[in-house]
């Protein structure tokens, strides 16, 4: 669990923003959402494979861009 120390005369909004940034950096919320419901191993593999395929096609698309004609 990320913790922050609130400095003297520090506004609450600034401390809250620092805390949110620390939580996001640790990946706590994404892990919590992933573990909220049980996911069968086959479903997890299928989802990860689909994400990998999507990343692959996205990478290929970005490499095959035509040259810009100004």
From Swiss-Prot:
Gene3D superfamilies in the cross-refs: Ribosomal protein S8
Show the GO MF annotations.
Answer: structural constituent of ribosome
What InterPro entries does the record point to? Answer: Ribosomal_bS21, Ribosomal_bS21_CS, Ribosomal_bS21_sf
Per the UniProt entry, what are the Gene Ontology biological process annotations, in alphabetical order?
translation
Any one cellular component term from GO for this entry?
ribosome
Alphabetically ordered keywords of this record: Ribonucleoprotein, Ribosomal protein
Its domain of life reads Bacteria
The similarity annotation says: Belongs to the bacterial ribosomal protein bS21 family.
UniProt name for this protein? Small ribosomal subunit protein bS21
Q: List the source organism.
A: Chromobacterium violaceum (strain ATCC 12472 / DSM 30191 / JCM 1249 / CCUG 213 / NBRC 12614 / NCIMB 9131 / NCTC 9757 / MK)
Designated gene of the protein: rpsU
């Amino acid at each position: 669990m990320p913790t922050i120390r609130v400095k003297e005369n520090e506004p609450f909004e600034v401390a809250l923003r620092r805390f949110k940034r620390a939580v996001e950096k640790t990946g706590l919320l994404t892990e919590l959402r992933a573990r909220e419901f049980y996911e069968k191993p086959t479903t997890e593999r299928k989802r990860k494979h689909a994400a990998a395929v999507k990343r692959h096609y996205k990478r290929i698309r970005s490499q095959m861009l035509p040259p810009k004609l100004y």
